Regions:
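N-terminal, positively charged nucleic-acid-binding surface of large information/translation enzymes
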Residues: 1-50, 390-399
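Short, glycine/charge-rich beta-strand/loop segments that flank catalytic centers
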Residues: 3-8, 39-42, 52-67, 85-94
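Non-catalytic interaction-recognition regions
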Residues: 29-33, 43-69, 77-79, 183, ...
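Alpha-helical recognition segments enriched in aromatics with Gly/Pro capping
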Residues: 43-44, 65-279
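Surface-exposed helix-capping loop/turn segments at secondary-structure junctions
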Residues: 48-55, 80, 172, 279-288
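Short catalytic-loop micro-motif centered on adjacent basic/acidic residues
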Residues: 54-58, 176-178, 324
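Structural preference for alpha-helix termini/caps and helix-kink/transition segments
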Residues: 219-222, 226-402
Length: 402
């Protein structure tokens, strides 16, 4: 997995402001500080989600030389042209199968898309041409810029992936993964520059594209104020592993709709599996028959393009109708694939009320004692945002998950 810390502009167009520099300005810090902050948050979150740490996580800023080398190779082969004062571009008209990732009928689709959302910049020969290297604006110093044979500048948004992937995986490799939104532009341009540079077709043998998490049936977006961090999930009384289980409920090629009810159901299902395993351990001696096909059922689900919903279905069936070999096979599945603490001896942490919620509840209790009912109502509303309802009792209060 590579880490982008330079070169991504605010849109798919080849002009505008670098995203990191934009957020650095908004948060009054450097672009490197922004990159480091969110890299550390990301690594912390994936650790809590029991996602294995990647063997190599290269950063774009550490591989500028490799990116420049690819640009130079493409220039030497005659695939590029320069727009004065702007940058060096890939001439997609020289690539006979440009856009093939959009098969079937990619040439027709590409023609339709030539009047599409790709902004046509002054000087571009074709709407689908894309920047390999951007020149730094005159009399303007960017935080993230480097020297190159063509002067100071910064890489286009696609070149870093080709550079880092080929450095660590070779000029041709098996699996490339990314979001479905990258098919028409980012991954299409990666293929174009990489196959022209390294003369390997296909550059990648298999491409996996995931769909996205939605919220309440709609797009998840910061502009819509409907995003959730892992901290938000924990503050609402859920374990990161409840969220991990929730993700398994949709195959990666399908959209997954995030709602409070769906996450609650995922939590209940996970805790239900834990209870079934505890019962199975206690009653193991009473079992006699063997399910000779159980391992194959799990393997078939995973072999069906990582069909995790099918895998969960087989898991629930296996634990509802246990056999002598069920426990060992499920334990292997848990250790190698699921990693959701199914064999945990203590799941009390899943039932704890987060400290932040308890603090709010105590503050509301004090507000009522002080007859500050406006503040008490305000805190009640805030608790509702954490999916908690507070009920007054003779001894104080009771918190109910709603």
């Amino acid at each position: 997995m590579n880490i982008t810390d330079v070169g991504h502009l605010v849109s798919d167009a080849d002009d505008g402001e670098d995203k990191l520099e934009k957020w650095a300005r908004l948060e009054s810090c450097s672009a490197r500080d922004i990159a480091k902050k969110y890299e550390e948050l990301f690594l912390s979150d994936i650790a809590e989600l029991n996602i294995d740490r990647f063997d190599v996580m290269p950063r774009a800023t550490d591989h500028i030389a490799e990116q420049i080398a690819i640009v130079q190779t493409l220039e030497n082969k005659g695939y590029t042209y320069t727009i004065e004062g702007d940058g060096m571009y890939m001439d997609t008209s020289k690539i006979s199968d440009y856009g093939k990732l959009m098969w079937p009928n990619y040439k027709k689709r590409l023609a339709d898309l030539n009047a599409w959302e790709r902004v046509e910049m002054k000087g571009k020969k074709n709407p689908t041409d894309f920047a390999l290297w951007k020149f730094s604006p005159t009399n303007t110093q960017r935080q993230m810029e480097r020297d190159s044979p063509r002067g100071k500048g910064f890489p286009g948004r696609h070149i870093e992936c080709s550079a880092m992937a080929t450095k660590y995986l070779g000029e041709r490799f098996d699996i490339h993964h990314g979001g479905s939104d990258h098919i028409t532009i980012h991954h299409t341009n990666e293929i174009a520059q990489s196959e022209c540079c390294f003369d390997h077709k296909p550059w990648v043998n298999y491409r996996l594209h995931n769909e996205f998490l939605q919220v309440d049936g709609g797009k998840m977006s910061k502009s819509l104020w409907n995003t959730y961090s892992l901290k938000d999930i924990k503050d609402r009384g859920f374990s990161p592993l409840d969220l991990r289980y929730f993700y398994f409920k949709a195959q990666y090629t399908n959209f997954l709709n995030f709602t409070r009810e769906a996450l609650t159901q995922a939590k209940n299902e996970r805790l239900g599996l834990i209870k079934k395993i505890k019962n199975l351990i206690q009653n193991q001696d009473s079992l006699s028959s063997v399910d000779a096909d159980l391992q194959n059922k799990f393997d078939q689900a995973l072999g069906d393009n990582l069909n995790t919903p099918k895998l969960l279905t087989q898991l629930h069936i296996a634990l509802s109708e246990p056999h002598v070999n069920t426990l060992d096979i499920v334990k292997t599945l848990e250790e190698k694939v699921l990693k959701i603490r199914l064999f945990s001896s203590d799941d009390s942490s899943d039932l704890d009320i987060p400290e932040q919620i308890m603090v709010l509840a105590e503050q509301r209790k004090q507000a009522k004692a002080d007859k500050n009912y406006a503040l008490a109502d305000q805190i009640r509303t805030e608790l509702a945002s954490y999916w908690r309802e507070i009920k007054d009792t003779k001894d104080g209060f009771e918190l109910i998950k709603n």
